[in-house]
From Swiss-Prot:
Quaternary state and interactors: Homotetramer.
Designated name of the protein: Argininosuccinate synthase
Originating organism: Mycolicibacterium smegmatis (strain ATCC 700084 / mc(2)155)
Molecular function terms from GO: argininosuccinate synthase activity; ATP binding
Positions of L-citrulline binding: 87, 123, 127, 175, 260, 272
An example Gene Ontology CC term for this record: cytoplasm
PROSITE patterns: ARGININOSUCCIN_SYN_1 (PS00564), ARGININOSUCCIN_SYN_2 (PS00565)
SUPFAM superfamilies linked to this entry: Adenine nucleotide alpha hydrolases-like, Argininosuccinate synthetase, C-terminal domain
């Protein structure tokens, strides 16, 4: 038996064509691996059978929904990760999990080569291949879409010439990637920055005006930075994301129209839908404002940004990212409590906070009777705080 190729299989055009193409061009058997990340759409058994129909000798479906939520989405929540302050890493956090399961499949099915369907223009090629280099540097990597400059038209022609059983159309306008954490849409008329998204771009979210008269108030509970309840009901991380996808999505929350800086050096326009992700990150950030000491919170905002950049850049398995997560884990010790939010008209509004770990002291903060803040200490504090400014002003202004 020739050495097998382990293919990251989505069920779409490119990876379906890749199964047949790899067999013809390399003579190697293909094992297709499809990962269920809560993306919805087609039944995964249908996807598995399609891989076999396209020529895979084996097709494996991995249910990684809970693993994805707890080991990939949760660190994103705890790091309040928004690349360029907007994008909650919808695709970026899924790639290292896919890599992990492809490497596992390679060991189990006699694979010496792993393959993906990424282009040479995007970030995902980096995320996959740096991931493979980190976990299994002995494996070879095959990237037919990138290395042989496939276009959609070429892929369709190959599928037709080789009777590959997949229904496609040259008119399909968008490239879509989705999982339970969110949905990413690009290409087509969206590549022209002045073009507004049309209704057919969206799937996870309703038009924000649909439920204009019925705002949704939700209370999210956290225990040490982990979402554990919604409106007092216990939930797993996956259940929290799924419920908030439905509720926030119904209010048009989580629509993002972004021009982002790709790792490869170009700017690209992306439309994201991430209702559950944006609500959870908003709630978690707000709870940290209540429970983290000032300097710790300030410093963590820097590490949050760096964590997001590392993940976006495909460095999930890097030493720095692991070190940052150790720091983040320490910061979550007191991030427990509840945040109340109103979801309405595409917006998230926080209107309530409570925590047994809160650093907010009512008696110190109030301006009413019972104020325990010693205002007589303020004059000396202000004098000392401004002392260096006063000294330098004397020199610089000649006073």
């Amino acid at each position: 038996m020739s050495e097998r190729v382990i293919l990251a299989y989505s069920g779409g055009l490119d990876t379906s064509v890749a199964i047949s193409w790899i067999g013809k061009e390399t003579g190697k058997e293909v094992v297709a691996v499809a990962i269920d990340l809560g993306q919805g759409g087609e039944d995964m058994e249908v996807v598995r059978q399609r891989a076999l129909d396209c020529g895979a000798v084996e097709a494996v479906v991995v249910d990684a929904r809970d693993e994805f939520a707890e080991e990939y989405c949760l660190p994103t929540i705890q790091s309040n990760a928004l690349y360029m302050d907007r994008y909650p890493l919808v695709s970026a956090i899924s790639r290292p999990l896919i890599v992990k399961h492809l490497v596992k499949a390679a060991r189990e099915h006699g694979g010496g080569v792993v393959a993906h369907g990424c282009t040479g223009k995007g970030n995902d090629q980096v995320r996959f291949e740096v991931g493979f280099a980190s976990l299994a540097p002995d494996l070879q990597v095959l990237a037919p879409v990138r290395d042989y400059a496939w276009t959609r038209e070429k892929a369709i022609a190959f599928a037709e010439e080789n009777a590959i059983p997949i229904n496609v159309t040259k008119r399909s306008p968008f490239s879509i990637d989705q999982n339970v954490w969110g949905r990413a849409v690009e290409t087509g008329f969206l590549e022209h920055l002045w073009n507004a998204p049309t209704k057919d771009v969206y799937d996870y979210t309703e038009d924000p005006t649909v439920h204009w008269n019925t705002p949704d108030e939700v209370v999210i509970g956290f225990d040490k930075g982990v979402p554990v309840s919604i409106d007092g009901r216990p939930v797993s991380v996956l259940q929290a994301i799924e419920e908030l996808n439905r509720r926030a999505g119904a209010q048009g929350v989580g629509r993002l129209d972004v021009v982002e800086d790709r790792l490869v050096g170009i700017k690209s326009r992306e439309i994201y839908e991430a209702p559950g992700a944006m609500v959870l990150i908003t709630a978690h950030t707000e709870l940290e404002h209540v429970t983290l000491e000032r300097e710790l919170g300030r410093f963590k905002r820097h590490t949050d940004q760096k964590w997001g950049e590392l993940v976006y850049d495909g460095l999930w398995y890097s030493p720095l990212k692991r070190a940052l997560e150790s720091f983040v884990a320490h910061t979550q010790e007191h991030v427990s409590g509840e945040i109340r939010l109103v979801l309405h008209g595409g917006h998230i509004s926080v209107n309530g906070r409570r925590s047994a770990e809160s650093l907010y002291d009512f008696n110190l903060a109030t301006y009413d009777e019972g104020d325990s803040f010693d205002q007589s200490a303020a004059k000396g504090f202000v004098h000392l705080h401004g002392l260096s400014s006063r000294i330098s002003a004397k020199r610089d202004l000649g006073i």
